[in-house]
Each structure stands twice: as structure tokens, then as C-alpha cells.
Amino acid sequence: MELEDIVNEEMPTTEDVNDMLEHTDKGRTKQTIRNCVTVLQKDPVLKKAIKRNELSGRMDIVKEVPWERRNNSSTVTDTDENNLKMYLEENYELTSERVIKAGVDIVSNENKYHPIRDYLESLVWDGIPRIENMLPHFLGAEKSKYTIGVMKMHMLAAISRIYEPGIKYDIMLCLVGSQGAGKSTFFKYLAIKEEWFSDNLDHLDDENIYRKLQNHWIIEMGEMKATITAKNIEQIKSFLSRQKETYKVPYEVHPEDRPRQCVFCGTSNDLNFLPLDRTGNRRFAPVMTDMSKAEVHILDNEAESKAYIEQAWAEAMVLYRQGNVFLGFTKEIEEEAKRLQKEFMPEDTNAGIIQEFLDDYDDDYVCTRILFDEALHRTGEMKQWEGKEIANIMNNAIVGWKPHGTHRFGKEYGIQRSWKRMKDSVKKDKDGFIEVPEQLEIPFE
């Protein structure tokens, strides 16, 4: 077979495609989904032109079409739909909107693609390690097992969310430091393309939150606004732990589960940016930046910065393909994560007041009512939320006491749930000195 014959066979004309369609006895094109699918699969202009974007969930036009498009975006617009209908009407007598809609849905799904997956698979690593140096290089962060570990974890999580949408990952990488260090730019460049990045997440209870996640890979919470405006810490935990959103996009009939394909990042100039959580802020991975120690500012040479980050993604892809991907704090870095999580929380004044009270407290049993009255010096009836707050402090922030069950506290307080002083806890006498047991060995002569 000659080359010209092969080309002609692969690229049929509109007349050839018309001959493939089912017609009525009068020679008119039947308004069937099968006919529409055939046209979309075989027409020289429309073949592989419309694909379903697995990142956005929308349909994209990915090749040149015989009408003027409204903007530079690949996403199908109303104007595209109207031009497609006119093209099908003029060339194939297909006019049924129901048929055209169904045909486009079927064929675009057959031709689905993932732009980020395609990008990642196109990368070739040059063999030079960069992930371990990214945070020190651009942001002056300390190079340590912790900073290397959280950067690698976050990049592998971002890749995992593309290949395994909805995979469990509930940690937010947070960059802390002075304004102008390039923290937000770092995350924007990390997303590779501007359309894969978003910093438009200000409220976690936004009813249209899915629209702000859709089509984005790296999502920054600038100045941690979304966590600041959250109703409570549980709302933040729930949001970060969620693996999917369930919603119905416009023009679709049925709602669908949309597994998350994004990871979340935070930036802040405030050193006390984390919410007060006495159970621990394990969902946050804070990294302190220092612009004065950075090897380069990320904006000094945009092309070089982007090339560096692209090679870091190529390196991360090599690690991902090797397997053994762990999307959490390893034992090696967990202690440092806990220390930093506490360091970036606001001071817990009530916990400090209660701890000081208990250090001088005579009894070995205590309850929330005693702490409410005598430690915090509050008056009136203790509200339910106040009792919960005190219990939370006792269970998570106080040293030397443990939950005990019920205990009788006399006429004033009656039987209450209690905490008991632990045996190895020390108690001060009335003058503020620690009692030393007789058998304790004095460490000097």
C-alpha cells in the first residue's frame, strides 16, 4: 500500500464519513447517538479534538477547530458547543441536541487525558538531587532531616493524588517567615502552570468549595485565612482529612464523588499562625524561612527557578516509581514536627494558669468545678463548653495528672469526674518548696 493511500485511509473526508452513517429510506441522516459517535470519531476535523480532562472533570478542545474560539483556554465553552452543533448540522444533518450531547459525552470520555500526569511522565531527571535543597536554596530554611522529609513527603503526596486520586493525605506544608521571602511564589512555581495553582481558599465552609479545588493541584491558604475563619479546630481537621467532594456539576443530572487531586499549602508572616489545639496540630508541617540565608531569591531568575523545580519533580517521579511512598511523618522527623507545631501555636494561658494552680494544690484529686472556681476564678454556673475546655486542658496540656473516674469531693462539689495526681509527680509545700522523700539520695556531700 502506498503512503498516500495510508494517509487517505486514516483521514477520511466528510463524504466518506457520511457514507458510514445510518440513513432513512429517504436518504436523510438518522438522528441517533451511534451516528453522532461515528462522526466525532471519524471526521477529519473532530477526530480526537474533544477530550475529557481528568483533572478538571470538564471537556477540552485539544486541537485546532474550524471556528474562532473565545479565549486561550482549552475548556469547552457555550460558543464551542454552538459552533459544533452548526458544524454537525451543515456537514452531517445532525440536529438533535440530545443526540449531540450524548455523543460528545461518550467520545470525550473515550479520549480522556490528564494534563498533569502527561506532564509528569514527560520529565527526565538529570540525576542531580534537588528536593533536599529546595527549601534552603529558595527560602533559607534550615537543611535538616525534618525539612528534607516534609518537602519530599509533600511532593510525593502531590504525585500520588494525581495517580491515585483521593489517596489519604491530611498534612499541610506551611512556610513561615517575613513578607517578601517568596513563600507564595514558591508554591505557585511548584504548581508548574498558573492554572494548576490556586490561592483563592478563604473559607472552609464555602458551599462552592469544590469549584475552588477543581482543576487545581497546589492550593495555598495565604496567611492561613481559611483556618483563621474556621468555626473550630474540628472543622479544620475534617477539611484536611477529607478525601473527596460529592457534587453535581452544572448540566449534569447525577452528583458524583470527586476524589481529591490536590494538596494544601500554607503561608504566614505570623509566628503564632497555628490554631490552638491541645491535642496537637499534627496536620501541619511548619517550616521557618529566612530570606537572608537563601542561596537565591526565587524571583531573581524566573527561568532558572522554574527549571530547578521542574527537575525536582523529575526526581520525585523517580522516587514515586520506586515505590515505598509513605505519606506521613516518619518516626525520624515526628518529634521535630511536634516541637514546631507547639512553637507556632499561640500561648495557652489557661493551661498555664491551671498547671501553676495544680503545682501548689494540696489534694491528690481535682475536678473541673474546682478548677473553674479556684484556678480560673470564674463565677456563676459553669457552662458545658467551659467544662469541656477545662477537661481538654487536663487531658492534653497538664503534666503530672491523669483521668481517674469519679471521686467524692465533699458537700460543696459532691461526686464528680476527676483527675488524680500521678505517683511520680511532685507536690510543693505551703512555702512553695518541693517535698523530698526521706529515701531520696542527695546528689552531693
Model regions and ranges:
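N-terminal nucleic-acid engagement/recognition segments and initiation subdomains in replication
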Residues: 1-130, 145, 149, 380-385, ...
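P-loop NTPase catalytic core of nucleic-acid-dependent motor ATPases
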Residues: 104-214, 369
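AAA+/SF3 P-loop NTPase mechanochemical coupling elements
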Residues: 209-214, 249-267
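Short glycine-/polar-rich loops that comprise or flank the Walker A/P-loop
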Residues: 215-217, 243, 260-263, 279-285
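Conserved AAA+/SF3 P-loop NTPase catalytic/coupling segment centered on the Walker-B
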Residues: 218-240, 274-280
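Conserved catalytic/switch belt of AAA+ P-loop NTPases
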Residues: 233-256
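A short helix-turn-beta junction within AAA+ P-loop NTPase domains corresponding to the substrate/partner-engaging
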Residues: 276-295
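DNA transaction DNA-binding modules
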Residues: 327-445
